[in-house]
Amino acid sequence: MALNAQDIARIANLARLELSSTESERMLGQLNDFFGIVEKMQAVDTSGVSPLSHPVAAIQDIALRLREDIASEPDQRDANQRSAPAVERGLFLVPKVIE
């Protein structure tokens, strides 16, 4: 996958960024380099490799100490929302940012 100048202009527009031509050219090179690395990684055959849950597990047996998934703090929604400019039915209201 290779991007072109129009792709960079579209991405910048979607992100509401104003890029100079120099910045646009630099971004094009950096993103294409990144996608080149991703393509190389995708080309590697990993069909015989077991998934890892921890990088150290590849070289030694480890026992993960996982805790139970329980709430450890009381509900503080009301306290957290006191300083919010707008709240409705327990949710923060924010301005619309996507047209």
Swiss-Prot record:
Q: What is its EC number?
A: 6.3.5.-
What's in the keyword line of the UniProt record? ATP-binding, Ligase, Nucleotide-binding, Protein biosynthesis
Q: State any single GO MF term.
A: glutaminyl-tRNA synthase (glutamine-hydrolyzing) activity
Protein name, UniProt field: Aspartyl/glutamyl-tRNA(Asn/Gln) amidotransferase subunit C
Query: What family is reported?
Result: Belongs to the GatC family.
Tell me what organism the protein belongs to.
Delftia acidovorans (strain DSM 14801 / SPH-1)
Q: Which GO terms describe its biological process?
A: glutaminyl-tRNAGln biosynthesis via transamidation; regulation of translational fidelity; translation
Q: Which Gene3D superfamilies match?
A: Glu-tRNAGln amidotransferase C subunit, N-terminal domain (1.10.20.60)
**InterPro entries listed in its UniProt record:** Asp/Glu-ADT_sf_sub_c (IPR036113), GatC (IPR003837)
Q: Which domain of life is it from?
A: Bacteria
Q: Which PANTHER family match?
A: GLUTAMYL-TRNA(GLN) AMIDOTRANSFERASE SUBUNIT C, MITOCHONDRIAL
GN (gene name): gatC
